[in-house]
Amino acid sequence: KYFFVLFLALFESKRKNNLFFYKSKDIKLQIFRSLLSVIESGCFVLSFKYLSLANAHSIGSLAPVIVVALSAIILKEKVSAKTWIAIFIGFVGVLIILRPTSSIFDPKALLPLIAAFVLGLYQIITKKVSEHDANETSLFYTSIIGLIIMSLLASKFWTPIDGYSYAMFLGIG
C-alpha cells in the first residue's frame, strides 16, 4: 500500500514540477500524521481477526462523527446543535454494538473504535498540514513512514504467499 502511495507522490510531484515536495513547513506534524495512518490501518485490520466484518465496520464507521467532534475541539469550527445531537446518536449506536455492560464484552472490540478515533485525528491533521504543505508532500511522508514501519513489521511477521492468495490479489485489483 505505502509503496504505491510513494510512487503516486513521486509521480504527482514530477507532474507538477515540484522538486521540493519533500520539504514540509511542519515536519513533526507530518510524521505524527503518518504514524496515525499506520496505527489506524493496523487497528482496523487487526479488528477483523476478533470481530465480524459487520461489527468492525459498524464501529469503524463512527470516524466521520469523530471528525466533526474533533473539528469543533481542535480546529474551532462551528458545529450546530443538530449536528451534536447526531453525534450523540452515533455514539449511542456504537455503544449498542459494543454492549459494554454485557458479560461477553471483549476489549478487543475497542480496536475499530480506536481506529475510528485515530482516523478522525488523521483527517483533522491532514486539514491542518494542507494549509502549508502540498498534497504530494503529505503523500510522501505518509508513504515513507508507512513503508519503513511496515517493512520492519513484515520482516518479523511475513509468511509466504501461495498461488491462491496471488489469484485473490489479482481478482481484487
Segments and roles (model prediction):
Residues 1-39, 118-121, 141-156:
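Transmembrane alpha-helices of multi-pass small-molecule transport proteins
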Residues 3-7, 59-73, 88, 144-149:
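Alpha-helical transmembrane segments of compact multi-pass small-molecule transporters, enriched
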Residues 9, 103-158, 169-171:
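Transmembrane alpha-helical segments that form core, pore/gating elements
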Residues 18-43, 107-115, 160-173:
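Loop-to-transmembrane-helix transition segments
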Residues 32, 59-62, 82-85, 141-142:
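Hydrophobic core positions of alpha-helical segments in small-molecule transporters
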Residues 43-60, 131-136:
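Structural motif at transmembrane-helix junctions in multi-pass transporters
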Residues 46, 64-85, 157:
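C-terminal transmembrane-helix exit sites in multi-pass transporters
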